Every structure is written in C-alpha cells, then in structure tokens.
C-alpha cells in the first residue's frame, strides 16, 4: 500500500486513472479527487474539501 494514501482498499493507491480515495494524498494523482475540482489542480490530491458540487473546493478557490 502507498504510504501517502489513506485508502484501505486495494493493494496500492493507483490514482492515475480513477481516484476513489476521499483522502487521497498520492503525489501521482493526475485526476482531481473531488468532483468540484478541475482536473489540473494538483492540490486536490492533498486534503481537498468540497463545499458543493457547483462550488470550488477549499484548495482550488
């Protein structure tokens, strides 16, 4: 398991294609971990908090 990922399911944290970890901290995460973040937001992989589906998350405001 990747030490940077809090996800308990799966052998490793493979965030490159589909990040399903709500608290994914993978540096290799190339997809936003929450739906309100743009795909290019790297900070979304580090403790992103969504306020709503149509709003920006706290790290991408």
Curated annotation (Swiss-Prot):
Gene3D superfamilies, per database record: Metallothionein Isoform II (4.10.10.10)
Residue span of region Beta: 1-29
N-terminal signal peptide: none
Gene: MT1M
Annotated a divalent metal cation 2 binding sites: 7, 13, 15, 26
Binding site for a divalent metal cation 6: 37, 41, 44, 60
Keyword vocabulary terms for this entry: Cadmium, Copper, Metal-binding, Metal-thiolate cluster, Zinc
Assembly and binders: Monomer.
One annotated Gene Ontology cellular component of this protein: cytoplasm
Binding positions (a divalent metal cation 5): 34, 36-37, 50
Function: Metallothioneins have a high content of cysteine residues that bind various heavy metals; these proteins are transcriptionally regulated by both heavy metals and glucocorticoids.
Residues where a divalent metal cation 1 binds: 5, 7, 21, 24
Organism: Homo sapiens (Human)
Residues where a divalent metal cation 4 binds: 33-34, 44, 48
GO MF term (any one): metal ion binding
Residues binding a divalent metal cation 3: 15, 19, 24, 29
Region called Alpha, residue ranges: 30-61
Protein name: Metallothionein-1M
Domains: entry comment: Class I metallothioneins contain 2 metal-binding domains: four divalent ions are chelated within cluster A of the alpha domain and are coordinated via cysteinyl thiolate bridges to 11 cysteine ligands. Cluster B, the corresponding region within the beta domain, can ligate three divalent ions to 9 cysteines.
Residues annotated as binding a divalent metal cation 7: 50, 57, 59-60
GO biological process, one term: cellular response to cadmium ion
Family, similarity comment: Belongs to the metallothionein superfamily. Type 1 family.
Cross-referenced PANTHER family: METALLOTHIONEIN, METALLOTHIONEIN-1E-RELATED
Keyword Zinc: yes
Cross-referenced SUPFAM superfamilies: Metallothionein (SSF57868)
Metal-binding among keywords: yes
């Amino acid at each position: 398991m990747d030490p940077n990922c809090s996800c308990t399911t799966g052998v490793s944290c493979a965030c490159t294609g589909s990040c399903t970890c709500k608290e994914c901290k993978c540096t290799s995460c190339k997809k936003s971990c929450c739906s309100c973040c743009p795909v290019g937001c790297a900070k979304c992989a580090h403790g992103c908090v969504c306020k709503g589906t149509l709003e920006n998350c706290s790290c991408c405001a």
